[in-house]
Amino acid sequence: MLFNNDSGNAEFTQFNKLAEKFGIQFNYDSKNHVLGNQYEMGAIQIDPGNLIFKSARKVYIKEYSSLAIHSPAAAVLKDGKTIVAAVARIGKGAVFAVGDPWFYNEYEDGRKIPVEFENYKAAEDLIKWLIYQINGR
């Protein structure tokens, strides 16, 4: 798992050297700026049938670094045409990358963001996918 942040809050040069091995680059940008408590500005919709996020449909991700990808990576979460998260399969393993640490920060537990955001459910979906990568393949 590769969790980065937006360009103002993370190191990119060395991290991208690792990510490039998997066909992933974290862009030096910051997407989904949110003003105050206007949480809807940080909303990302998840389509049914998503490879990883099988139950979550709407998550809150603000100020993330977008991704650029090439083989073997594939996008697994987009905001319009912008890639938010990707997966790369290498040999018997898999790498998940996302441009924000939204699975383990203050937006995860449902106390700060409105209930319609399903960040906790998305984190559960990711954990189930990770376990399947170990046990189910």
Region locations from a protein language model:
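Extracellular ligand-binding/catalytic regions of CAZymes and related secreted enzymes
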Residues: 25, 90-93, 101-137
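Second-shell loop/turn segments in exported
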Residues: 1-8, 111-116
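Short, well-ordered beta-to-alpha junction loops that form the rim of enzyme active sites
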Residues: 80, 99-101
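A broadly tuned preference for mixed-charge, low-complexity surface segments
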Residues: 1, 55-59, 126, 136-137
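Noncatalytic linker/hinge segments flanking ATPase motor cores
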Residues: 40-49, 98, 128, 136-137
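An acidic, glycine-rich "communication" segment
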Residues: 5-90
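Structural recognition of the beta-strand scaffold that forms the well-ordered cores
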Residues: 1-3, 77, 95-97
